[in-house]
Amino acid sequence: VKVPAPFAWNEDFATSYKFIDLEHRTLFNGLFALSEFNTRDQLLACKEVFVMHFRDEQGQMEKANYEHFEEHKGIHEGFLEKMGHWKAPVAQKDIRFGMEWLVNHIPAEDFKYKGKL
């Protein structure tokens, strides 16, 4: 999936769950802000929205007994592990990785739970 320019959520990433789509917007906004204002505070804020979203999304999956929950959780944990190594100012290659990961993760992984949560 191509990284949108400017980097922002759009309907191509809609999951059909309003609360998840709203949180996905915050992920896009967090990475965009980090690319524009590459500070320690912005990095911490970006990490925080990812942690919060993954917790919320995984909670919904668990509640619905989503069959791919453990696999999906592992993918989230792998991303957070990589993000945990980022230090401000974050290298552009790492920010780009985060953007590419997000635009690929939503259609490849999150779309699998459409109609199942």
Swiss-Prot record:
Gene3D superfamilies with a match to the protein in the record: Hemerythrin-like
Residues that bind Fe cation 2: 57, 72, 76, 105, 110
Ligand binding (Fe cation 1): 24, 53, 57, 110
CDD domains: Hemerythrin
Keywords: Iron, Metal-binding, Oxygen transport, Transport
PROSITE patterns: HEMERYTHRINS
InterPro entries to which the protein is assigned, alphabetical: Haemerythrin, Haemerythrin_Fe_BS, Hemerythrin, Hemerythrin-like, Hemerythrin-like_sf, Hemerythrin_metal-bd
Recorded GO MF terms: iron ion binding; oxygen carrier activity
NCBIfam families per UniProt: hemeryth_dom, Hemerythrin
Family label: Belongs to the hemerythrin family.
Function description: Hemerythrin is a respiratory protein in blood cells of certain marine worms. The oxygen-binding site in each chain contains two iron atoms.
Assembly with partners or alone: Octamer composed of two types of chains: alpha and beta.
The protein's name in its UniProt record: Hemerythrin subunit alpha
